[in-house]
Amino acid sequence: MSANTSMVTEFLLLGFSHLADLQGLLFSVFLTIYLLTVAGNFLIVVLVSTDAALQSPMYFFLRTLSALEIGYTSVTVPLLLHHLLTGRRHISRSGCALQMFFFLFFGATECCLLAAMAYDRYAAICEPLRYPLLLSHRVCLQLAGSAWACGVLVGLGHTPFIFSLPFCGPNTIPQFFCEIQPVLQLVCGDTSLNELQIILATALLILCPFGLILGSYGRILVTIFRIPSVAGRRKAFSTCSSHLIMVSLFYGTALFIYIRPKASYDPATDPLVSLFYAVVTPILNPIIYSLRNTEVKAALKRTIQKTVPMEI
C-alpha cells in the first residue's frame, strides 16, 4: 500500500449547502423539529416511568422506542444545526466513524424493536388469554435486549471495516451526515465485499422485521373485522393503519437507500429520502404511537394535576 492511500483525515458534509439563501430558515425548521422530537419522546419516557397505569408490555416498548428516538435523532440533527449555523461543514475521520456507528446502532435497534412492538399488538389482540404468558416481563426484557444487541452488532459489523479501508480523496460527502453509501464512494480500494455485507444486513434487518410486522398486522386486521361493533372496528383499524403507515415510511425509505449498490447513490435525491427515516419518523412516532392514545393522555393529565394543583 502506498504512503498516501489513507491521506484523508477529515470529511466535508455538503448537506444542504447548495441552498445558500435558506440556511437560516433550514436552521429554524430543523431546530424546531429536534426540540419537539426530544420533548415529545422524553415526555413519553417520563409518563411511562412514573404512571402506574402505564406498566403494560405495550408501554414498556413505547418507552424504549421513545428513548431510542432521542438518541437516534441526536446523532445527526445537532451536527446539522451546527453546520447550518456556522457554515463549517468539516467532520474528522474519527467523528465520522462514531456518527456512522451510532446511526447504525440506533437504526438497527429500531428495526428490531418495531417488530417486537408488532408482536406485542398481535398477542394482545389475537391471543388475549395467553397475552400475560407470551409477553411476560422477562420476555419483554429479552426482546428489548435482543434489539439493542442487534444494534451493537450492526454498528460494529460495518463501521470498523469501512474505516479500515483507504481514503485517498476526494473527501466530500453529498449528505448531511456520515451515511454508509456516500462514504463508501470515497474509498479508493475494492468495496464489493462491504456492499454485499450491506445488502445482506439490509435484507435481514429491514425485510425480515418488516415482513413480520406485515404478517402480525395482517392477523390483527382479520381479528378486527370480526369485531361486532362498527365503532370498535373503526377505532382499531384507525390505530393499525397509522402504525402501518409509520413502519412503511421508516422501512421503505431505509430499504430504498441501503438495498442498492453504492454506484446508484443519487446526491440530489437520496439525502431527502434519508430525512424521512433520520429526522421525520422520530418526531412522528410519539404522536402516532403514544400521544393519540387515551391512556397516555389521561396519564399526562394526572401528571399535570399533581405538578400544578388546579382544575384542568
Curated annotation (Swiss-Prot):
Segments on the Extracellular side according to the record's topology features: 1-24, 75-98, 160-196, 258-270
SUPFAM superfamilies: Family A G protein-coupled receptor-like
Single GO cellular component term: plasma membrane
GO biological process: detection of chemical stimulus involved in sensory perception of smell
Gene3D superfamilies registered for this protein in UniProt: Rhodopsin 7-helix transmembrane proteins
Membrane topology of this protein: Multi-pass membrane protein
Annotated GO MF terms: G protein-coupled receptor activity; olfactory receptor activity
Summary of the function given for this chain in its UniProt record: Odorant receptor.
Listed name of the protein: Olfactory receptor 10C1
Native species: Homo sapiens
Organism phylogeny: Eukaryota, Metazoa, Chordata, Craniata, Vertebrata
